[in-house]
Structure formats: C-alpha cells, structure tokens
Design a protein with these regions (language model features):
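Short, small-residue-biased leader/transition segments that mark boundaries at the very start
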Residues: 1-8
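Low-complexity, Pro/Ser/Thr- and charge-rich linker/hinge segments at domain boundaries
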Residues: 9-25
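Short, isolated positions in well-ordered beta-strands
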Residues: 30-31
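Acidic/histidine-rich helix-loop elements
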Residues: 37-48, 109, 113-116
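Active-site mouth loops of central-metabolism enzymes
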Residues: 40-53, 132-139
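Short, acidic/polar
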Residues: 47-60, 142-149
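Catalytic domains of carbohydrate-active enzymes, especially glycoside hydrolases
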Residues: 53-72, 77
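Substrate-binding/catalytic cleft of secreted carbohydrate-active enzymes
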Residues: 68-238
C-alpha cells in the first residue's frame, strides 16, 4: 500500500477591526507565539540522536503552549519539517548565514544601541564590505542557497514565512532576495530582514529588542517582535 497526505492552508496578513495588521491562518487572525530554534543537540551538536528525539522535542514545544518555531541559521532534515507538519507547528525558516568575517561593531553593538538610527541603513553595494558581502562569489553562493532552500522546503505546509536575512549577517540587496522568493513561492510570507537594516519590503516589520521598552507604531506591514531577551533563568547545579 502507498499512502500520502495533503494540507490546504492559506497564510496572509489582514487588518483587524481596529485596522491593525494581523497574521492570519486561513483568513483568521492567529497569535504567533514561538521560540528561536537553533537546532542544537547535546548528543550530536547539530545532529539529533534519533527521529524519536526530534518528535519528542517538537511535541514538548507544542505542549508548552507554543505554536511557532523560527528555525535560525540551520536547515533541518526533511523529517523535522514532517513532524512540524503533523503537529501543526508554524515554521519561520531563516536562510543559513554566510559571508566573510562579521564586523561585530557594525552588525551587533551599534545596531543594538542605535536601532532607530541604524534600521534604515541601505544594504546596497557601498555597504557590502561592512555587511561581509564584498565578494561576488559569496553573493552568488547565497543566491544559489536561497533558491535551493525554498525549492527543498516549499512542499512542507508548516513553513509559514521565509527569512532571507538576520541582523545584517551577510545581508545585501534584501529587496532582490524577496523578489527571488516571491518568484519561487508566492504562498508564504516573507520577513525581509529580521532585526535591523530594514529595507521596507516583505510582509513583516521585524523587531529585535533587547534593551528598550517596546513601542510599536502602526505600520504598513505586520509587526513581529522576532527576537527579544537578555533574560536569564539560573538553574541550581546547572
């Protein structure tokens, strides 16, 4: 016997009764409450010990009340996405970071402290060196990996949003990356630049807030607090 499965779903952004843009699943507003998931395992670093361990971890995420995982800096095996499909977990899929050695003062320290000033910095050719993408071969490698990633994972209904860049790590021409994604898959949302160096495109106004009180103004894109923190929970004996 040969079996198969299918899923019909629609993801969008639409205004609520007050005119505030909300994430929607099948035309109904949904509060996305999730975790930043880098896919580490104590037994094998980036390699899970078993398929059962993957399923158990994802089931625990669901049991804890989360409905979203932002898969950060890693592409998982297909079975990981299969389990997310089955469990009804939404995945925001980051592209794997690349480029040359990062200028941490530019992409981490200054942007955290001077967010309002730095967010609108353009990611065009004059800044590619500061953003660690001065090499044409590096930019071509990113374009190839972007296309391969979308083509490999677009069959999974759990994938709800593509995230081409995170915090300026190897970022360049984010608008072009969004256009490439739209050409390959126009059924998902796109978070053009998670954190900073926002170019005004995609579907998400994506904020990383580690130090300041959160103040959100109405936007033409749906607002997401896609990272926050500096929060620790000390565990005795850990």
């Amino acid at each position: 016997l040969v079996g198969s499965e299918m899923c019909i779903r629609d993801r969008s952004c639409a205004p609520d009764a007050r005119g505030v843009l909300r994430f929607c699943l099948n035309d109904k507003p949904i509060l996305l409450n999730g975790l930043l998931d880098q896919g580490y395992w104590p037994e094998g670093l980036y390699t899970p010990p078993s398929d059962a361990a993957v399923e158990r971890e994802l089931s625990e995420v669901k049991a804890l009340g989360y409905n979203l995982l932002r898969k950060h800096a890693k592409i998982e095996p297909q079975r990981w996405y299969y389990h997310c499909d089955k469990l009804g977990l939404v995945v925001w899929q980051d592209m794997v970071n690349g480029g040359s050695k990062y200028n941490l003062w530019f992409v981490t320290y200054l942007t955290n402290v001077l967010q309002p000033l730095m967010r609108r910095l353009p990611d065009k050719a004059p800044l590619w060196g500061l953003l660690s993408r001065s090499s044409e071969s590096s930019r071509e490698e990113y374009r190839r990996e972007l296309e391969d990633t979308v083509q490999a994972l677009r069959c999974h209904p759990c994938v709800g949003c593509w995230v081409p860049f995170n915090e300026g790590w190897g970022q360049y021409d984010a608008a072009g990356a969004v256009q490439t994604i739209r050409t390959l898959d126009d059924t998902r949302l796109v978070d053009e630049a998670s954190g900073w160096y926002d170019q005004g495109g995609g579907d998400v106004y994506s904020l990383h807030n580690y130090f300041y009180p959160l103040r959100v103004r109405p936007q033409t894109r749906t607002v997401a607090l896609s990272e926050y923190g500096g929060i620790a929970w000390p565990m005795p004996g850990h």
